[in-house]
């Protein structure tokens, strides 16, 4: 994944994650590198770790606390934020700690082995594969097509979904979506009616970037392939009662179907 470079350099280590905003002043002991009681993670060391928290807060003295951590050899190997602010960014630069922001922090889990390039903004997680896929919602009148995934597919077996598939190398999401529809439903008479911003989902060893599309069909029935066992045409409001793949209901909302 790629965020915004804040402080140059490379760092790696196990993730230590705080859900709330963090102040280095009073939040960590520079002499030990251990977090304080106020953080809710008292005694946890950030020394040599990739320290992940939403944003900084507190006094500008916090910048010097980060520098003090470095003087004691207890600085984190890197810092990741959702949104950087001046105090932490300044401290990271002063202490030569690689830092990246503009990341979806929900994709990280405590103890992940994380690699950070603060010069390019590239961040990766060891053992976690990243894939780009498309999901197309097929609409006919006031109903949408819901497909049950078979036991032969690699993920989310038995769950209900739209028409989904990988974006192949050299292919754009706009090219992948209609190709998957033709392959999985054996139809050609469809027109694009909308699209939404990508959704990024973390499952244990996988990060999925999902590109949602909406296509309209008129009167044409479908012929499903081996990837699905059955299908239903339903009003979008009824989909919430089904066991759908992760992010599916959000896709419907983003496509303004709910």
Regions found by a protein language model. Give the residues of each.
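Conserved Nudix-box catalytic region and its N-terminal flanking loop in Nudix hydrolases
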Residues: 143-187
